[in-house]
Amino acid sequence: MFARYEAALVGNDRAVLDELFWNSAHTLRYGFSENHYGHADIRVFRASLPLQSPLRELLRTVITTYGRDFATANVEFRRQGAGNQQIGRQSQTWMRTDEGWRVVAAHVSFIA
């Protein structure tokens, strides 16, 4: 599921990204400079982004399961592009629902 999320993120497939976030007011996403609470708020934010997502290289990915219905995915990445080699971190908490695995909490930030 993480690979599907990553492909949607890099490809800016908003429909898949919206699908993979739990459709709940309890879902949250802490971004680089913003906080979003609830699936609807996250969806509005995502719709405001440019159509092309910045390229990135995954440096390290750690996926850990806790039982059969709960997991975390943590990534260290490097932004690609003209003179931009920032190192970032992304954390996701995944929960298995009746619809499948969904992100219930996410955080993304850069290392200063």
Question: Over which residues does each language-model region extend?
Answer:
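Short, well-ordered beta-strand segments in beta-rich or mixed alpha/beta enzyme
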Residues: 20-21, 28-30, 70-80, 91-93
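Surface-exposed, charged secondary-structure patches
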Residues: 41-84
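Short, well-ordered alpha-helical segments enriched in acidic and aromatic residues
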Residues: 11-26
